[in-house]
Amino acid sequence: MQGNLSAWLVKHALIHRSLGFDYQGIETLQIKPGDWHSIAVILYVYGYNYLRSQCAYDVAPGGLLASVYHLTRIEYGVDQPEEVCIKVFAPRKDPRIPSVFWVWKSVDFQERESYDMLGISYDNHPRLKRILMPESWIGWPLRKDYIAPNFYEIQDAH
């Protein structure tokens, strides 16, 4: 079964994969990293101009990393929003996904957090650097294969 957006993407020959619907009836689509930026621009023009959230997670130890975007389209009024969830998977060895900062500015800190915690590099992000961990931190703390150091020192703020 396809949702409205998935049918529209098929009609316009935009490559994606439907991953089904969640309990609220929101469709989840998988987009390849190489197609993500152009599809993001198309979605914005189509009316998905509100990025509700962006997050990332480690799918499995040694497996893929996923960047997840929740988008909303409010066309017929605030009480009837159309929502979609986009998942972009990246290989663990060199996880690179195009940044959508230039499409939705609100993704700034969220992509930085995903970089800081999981090591996903968002290409063309204007300030991609650590946001929660010290710049000297080694590794990506939310990866399932991350080994926490036995000792670390956090310096006092001066």
Curated annotation (Swiss-Prot):
Gene Ontology molecular functions: NADH dehydrogenase (ubiquinone) activity; quinone binding
PROSITE patterns to which the protein is assigned, alphabetical: COMPLEX1_30K
Presence of the UniProt keyword NAD in the record: yes
One record GO biological process: photosynthesis, light reaction
Domain of life, per lineage: Eukaryota
Membrane-topology annotation of the record: Peripheral membrane protein
Enzyme class per UniProt: translocase
Keyword Plastid included in the entry's annotation: yes
Reactions the enzyme catalyzes: a plastoquinone + NADH + (n+1) H(+)(in) = a plastoquinol + NAD(+) + n H(+)(out); a plastoquinone + NADPH + (n+1) H(+)(in) = a plastoquinol + NADP(+) + n H(+)(out)
InterPro entries: NADH_DH_suC, NADH_quin_OxRdtase_su_C/D-like, NADH_UbQ_OxRdtase_30kDa_su, NADH_UbQ_OxRdtase_CS
GO CC terms of this entry: chloroplast thylakoid membrane
Subcellular location: Plastid, Chloroplast thylakoid membrane
The enzyme's E.C. designation: 7.1.1.-
Keywords per UniProt: Chloroplast, Membrane, NAD, NADP, Plastid, Plastoquinone, Quinone, Thylakoid, Translocase, Transport
Main location: plastid
Biological function: NDH shuttles electrons from NAD(P)H:plastoquinone, via FMN and iron-sulfur (Fe-S) centers, to quinones in the photosynthetic chain and possibly in a chloroplast respiratory chain. The immediate electron acceptor for the enzyme in this species is believed to be plastoquinone. Couples the redox reaction to proton translocation, and thus conserves the redox energy in a proton gradient.
PANTHER family per the UniProt record, alphabetical: NADH DEHYDROGENASE [UBIQUINONE] IRON-SULFUR PROTEIN 3, MITOCHONDRIAL (PTHR10884:SF14), NADH DEHYDROGENASE UBIQUINONE IRON-SULFUR PROTEIN 3 (PTHR10884)
Family the entry assigns: Belongs to the complex I 30 kDa subunit family.
Quaternary structure and interacting proteins, as annotated: NDH is composed of at least 16 different subunits, 5 of which are encoded in the nucleus.
Name of protein: NAD(P)H-quinone oxidoreductase subunit J, chloroplastic
